C-alpha cells in the first residue's frame, strides 16, 4: 500500500473515533468564512466556497451555520477576521510536516504551534523548508463497492483524472490537478457514483518510513496539532510498514 493510501486509511479510522464535532464545525466555519471573503458568497462562482459547503454538509452542519459563516465572510454579518498562515517543520523520525492555520491572533498561534511541535518531538522550520517536498492536488475517495477500477478510470479520464490509487481495500483514491477537482466531482455526481472526502490535499513526492516508536510519536503529534483551535489541516510525508501499522491499530 502506498504511503498516501496508508495515511488515508489511518485518517479514516481516526475520524471514525473522533467525537470532537464541535471542533470540526469550528474549522469548517473558518474555511467557509475565508472562502467567502476571498471569492464572494456565491458558490457557483467560487469553487473553494463550494467545496467548503459540500464538506460542511457532508458532516451534517446545519444550513443556518453555513449561511452565517458565508455572511461573515462577505461582511454582511460582523465576526472575527481570519488570517491564513502556513507553518513548516519536522517531526519524529525526520518526517516533514506542513500545518495550515486560520487565526485571528498570529502571535498566539505561532506560540501554540511551536509549543506543540517541541513537546511532540518536532521543530518548526522556516517558510519553504519542507513545502518543496509536496504538491497540492485534488483528492477524492470512491468506495470500491460502487464501481470497478477500469470503469472508474474510463469515467474520469476526460474529466481530469491524474492518478488512481487502488491499493486500499475499501476505497479508490482519485488524484487530480487542483483545477480539475470540481469537474471530476461533477462527473461522479452525474454518473451517480458515491464519493467521500473531496478535498485539496498536499501529496509528498517521497515518504519517510518510521519504526513503531517514531510512528507512535508522529501520530500523537499530528493529533495534537489537529486538535489546536487555529489549525485547519496537517500534512506529512510519514509512512510505515504494514507490520507497524498493525501494531498501532491494536493499541
UniProtKB/Swiss-Prot annotation:
Gene Ontology biological-process entries: regulation of DNA-templated transcription
Any one Gene Ontology cellular component term annotated for this protein: cytosol
Domain of life of the native organism: Bacteria
Keywords linked to the UniProt accession: Cytoplasm, DNA-binding, Transcription, Transcription regulation
Location of this chain's protein in the cell: Cytoplasm
MF terms (GO), sorted A to Z: DNA binding
Family: Belongs to the TACO1 family.
The name this protein goes by in its record: Probable transcriptional regulatory protein CT1665
